């Protein structure tokens, strides 16, 4: 095992430094060394040490195990180990199991046209890149939910352990049911240093460290030292003990049923940073300090003596004992690696698309809200979607491959029908007064948006399906996690052996226009802008205006692969516009003219466009006001449900053709656009369109407080009166009556303001408004 570890370390150092002379058959020269030295050595030998020991455990007990790398900057180690076990060469045949393959392995690392420095999607066996730190443990737990035979060995960097996301991840054990789930073996990689500072956990006492993790509900097993001979024995013993405890916990839960939350084992692995590397460089201690974090010998061209140190370092691993003359790993070492899918680099759970099964989905049409006349029936859109999700849960109960995630908001977001079918999962103490709480639940709620997202990502990456519901304003907490998942998906599409996984779907509700009761802190629609920055072939944004369109969108997203879907929909009782047939057609098109709300007869004086449920209602109310004041005015109403359909087809695959866009929005008429979010995004999406200069967008202007629902729209000039005024101001034929209409609008807004201050609620004409354009036209 020590020889195998040496082989992994040798290949790791070689990746950082060498581009030629891979087996040191000649004296090392500067020409053998890369001109730019990139990578991270400090964490790598520890990762290699753990990998070989986990290989032994897999071999001994025939385990189904994946390796989740928190300190993903140790990329050379994971590449080295998947190469040694053979997986890497199977997926990348050009990196062959010989001297030429080793040379290719070395040259490609952190090199133009090669591979990245981290444990990215290109690395076999990876489900966690570990570039942005903090997510490994939540990914590991997400991976083992509903995977009873899987163990996720999760290496947590001690620097990473200082992040908020990782700190809350330790509580994931309160949601793990050993009767039905797999197990996570956390391994705290305590090498003492970050880039230039000591780590917090390395500088507290043994007793305090042990008490900390016992308090989290774990049984810590310590493996500490620097002597490889002793450390091999200690690690083997600790892993055997940890596996025995995991097996016993699962045996009892599966034979007797779940009773009490167990204390799961974990390992605290204290070893020197940069272990086995140069002890000193230029008289300064390197091994066991922060100086070994990246490239210990970074100035080979400037300091000739460093080349000799590098050669001595490489030769300390005795590569001639590890590889034969052709460069192949010696057979006795090759036998130490597991075979087939038992290899951690080849485990199908780390390439979840291989295991993905389609969900059994109900016919969403059967949950339709019956609509006769548009704008006269009310419904809670998300509650309607909750009925659909309830039955998704029911139909997939046997497969156990669907969960709902959210930060204590499933009930608040009106998805409560799912609790007719399942509970919230919790394996801690449950009181008689608790509702919908059990160890067998399939709704995962914890008040950490990061933990919800990380669990869901781990669940999706290992071949299952999920759904994330969240307050719109607070989804920003996972902005950066969204970034990383979008980047992961982008790279996976470019890696042929990575199979498509289920899309990550957000339902953002309790949104900005209905957070009047909670105030300014809860009012922010900017996640859409953030999402729109990512690759067009990854992201989708939907703004269904009512319950039937929401049903159609949710069903579509549940069937999609390799996307990030963002759905924004309100939970409050709202007017409904489209029957199910019209809703399906509208969602399929992405946007369209609502003929029943238009009177333009093919030649509008202005276009009133809308995207989002509240903007749609306000836009239609504005149309009624304008048509009542100016009966001969021709208005066209366009509703947008797929926001990216606005973008040019050269920029997004959902973008409608330019000629179709021009027919819909005209090439020269004013377009008054009522939009759910920040107005700038609509201008950005439409800037390549012919008529973009005539788009006048009303949306959120960062005005808000605790007030009434309609006043939120007024504060941001998204209300029906400001929209109506905007139409009148921009139609040339209305120049004469424009001033009088402006006075009318001002009087209505003053009436509104006085009423809400006196009564604390919106005017009856606002609260009770219905779409009655036909009655207006008949006047």
Curated annotation (Swiss-Prot):
GO terms for molecular function: aldehyde-lyase activity. PROSITE patterns: PHOSPHOKETOLASE_1 (PS60002), PHOSPHOKETOLASE_2 (PS60003). Keywords: Lyase, Plasmid, Thiamine pyrophosphate. It holds the Pfam family XFP_N. Disulfide bonds: none annotated. InterPro entries: Phosphoketolase (IPR023962), THDP-binding (IPR029061), Transketo_C/PFOR_II (IPR009014), Xul5P/Fru6P_PKetolase (IPR005593), Xul5P/Fru6P_PKetolase_C (IPR018969), Xul5P/Fru6P_PKetolase_CS (IPR019790), Xul5P/Fru6P_PKetolase_N (IPR018970), Xul5P/Fru6P_PKetolase_ThDP_BS (IPR019789). Its cofactor is thiamine diphosphate. Its EC number is 4.1.2.-. GO terms for biological process: carbohydrate metabolic process. HAMAP family: Phosphoketolase. Belongs to the XFP family. This is Probable phosphoketolase 2.
């Amino acid at each position: 095992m020590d020889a195998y570890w040496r082989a992994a370390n040798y290949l790791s150092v070689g990746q950082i430094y060498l581009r030629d002379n891979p087996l040191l058959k000649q004296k090392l020269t500067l020409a053998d060394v890369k001109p730019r030295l990139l990578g991270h050595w400090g964490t790598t030998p520890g990762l290699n040490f753990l990998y070989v020991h986990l290989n032994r455990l897999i071999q001994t007990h025939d385990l189904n195990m994946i390796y989740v790398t928190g300190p993903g900057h140790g990329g050379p180690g994971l590449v080295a180990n998947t190469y040694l076990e053979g997986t890497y060469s199977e997926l990348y045949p050009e990196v062959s199991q010989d001297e030429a393959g080793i040379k290719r392995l070395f040259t490609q690392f952190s090199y133009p046209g090669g591979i990245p420095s981290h444990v990215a999607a290109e690395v076999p066996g990876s489900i966690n890149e570990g570039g942005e730190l903090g997510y490994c443990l939540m990914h590991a737990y997400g991976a083992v939910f509903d995977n009873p035979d899987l163990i996720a060995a999760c290496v947590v960097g001690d620097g990473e352990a200082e992040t908020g996301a990782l700190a809350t991840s330790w509580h994931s054990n309160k949601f793990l049911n050993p009767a039905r789930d797999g197990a996570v073996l956390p391994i705290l990689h305590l090498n003492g240093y970050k880039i230039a500072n000591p780590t917090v956990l390395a500088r507290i006492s043994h007793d305090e460290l042990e008490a900390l993790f016992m308090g989290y509900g774990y049984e810590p097993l310590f493996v500490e030292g620097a002597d490889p001979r002793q450390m091999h024995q200690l690690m083997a013993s600790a892993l055997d003990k940890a596996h025995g405890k995991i097996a016993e916990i699962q045996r009892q839960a599966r034979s007797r049923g779940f009773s009490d939350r167990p204390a799961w084992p974990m390992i605290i692995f204290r070893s020197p940073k940069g272990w086995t590397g140069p002890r000193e460089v230029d008289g300064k201690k390197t091994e066991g300090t922060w100086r070994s974090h990246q490239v210990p010998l970074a100035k080979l061209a400037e300091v000739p003596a460093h080349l000799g140190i590098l050669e001595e370092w490489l030769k300390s691993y005795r590569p001639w004992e590890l590889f034969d003359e052709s460069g192949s790993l010696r057979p006795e070492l090759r036998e130490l690696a597991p075979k087939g899918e038992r290899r951690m680099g080849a485990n199908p759970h780390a390439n979840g698309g291989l295991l993905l099964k389609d969900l059994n989905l109900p016919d969403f049409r059967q949950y339709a809200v019956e609509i006769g006349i548009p704008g006269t029936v009310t419904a809670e859109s998300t509650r309607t979607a909750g009925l659909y999700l309830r039955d998704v849960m029911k139909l997939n109960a046997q497969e156990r491959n669907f969960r709902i995630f959210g930060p204590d908001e499933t009930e608040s977001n009106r998805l409560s029908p799912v609790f007719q079918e399942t509970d919230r999962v919790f394996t801690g103490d449950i009181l008689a007064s608790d509702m919908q709480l059990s160890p067998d639940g399939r709704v995962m709620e914890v008040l950490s948006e990061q933990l919800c997202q990380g669990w869901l990502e781990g669940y999706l990456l290992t071949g299952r399906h999920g759904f994330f519901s969240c307050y719109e304003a607070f989804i920003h907490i996972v902005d950066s996690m969204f970034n990383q998942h979008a980047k992961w998906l982008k790279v996976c599409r470019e890696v042929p052996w990575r199979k498509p996984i289920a899309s990550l779907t957000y339902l953002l509700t309790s949104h900005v226009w209905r957070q009047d009761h909670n105030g300014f802190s809860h009012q922010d629609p900017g996640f859409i802008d953030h999402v729109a920055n990512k690759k067009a072939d990854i992201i989708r944004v939907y703004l269904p205006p009512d319950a039937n369109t929401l049903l159609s969108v949710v069903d579509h997203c549940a069937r999609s692969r390799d996307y990030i879907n963002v759905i924004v929909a309100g939970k409050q009782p709202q007017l409904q516009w489209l029957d199910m047939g019209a809703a399906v057609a509208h969602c399929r098109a992405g946007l369209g003219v609502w003929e029943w709300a238009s009177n333009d007869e093919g030649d509008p004086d202005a276009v009133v466009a809308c995207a989002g449920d509240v903007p749609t209602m306000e836009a239609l109310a504005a149309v009624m006001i304008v048509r009542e004041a100016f009966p001969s005015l021709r208005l066209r109403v366009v509703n947008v449900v797929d926001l990216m359909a606005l973008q040019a087809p050269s920029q997004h695959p959902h973008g409608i053709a330019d000629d179709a866009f021009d027919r819909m929005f005209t090439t020269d008429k004013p377009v008054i656009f009522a939009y759910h979010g920040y107005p700038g995004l609509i201008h950005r999406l439409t800037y390549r369109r012919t008529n973009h200069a005539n788009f006048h967008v009303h949306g959120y202007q960062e005005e808000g407080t605790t007030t009434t629902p309609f006043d939120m729209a007024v504060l941001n000039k998204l209300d029906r009166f400001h929209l109506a005024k905007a139409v009148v101001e921009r139609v040339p034929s209305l120049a004469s009556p424009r001033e009088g209409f402006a006075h009318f609008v001002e009087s209505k807004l003053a009436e509104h303001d006085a009423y809400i201050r006196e009564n604390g609620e919106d005017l009856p004409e606002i609260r009770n408004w219905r779409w009655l354009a036909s009655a207006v036209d008949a006047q």
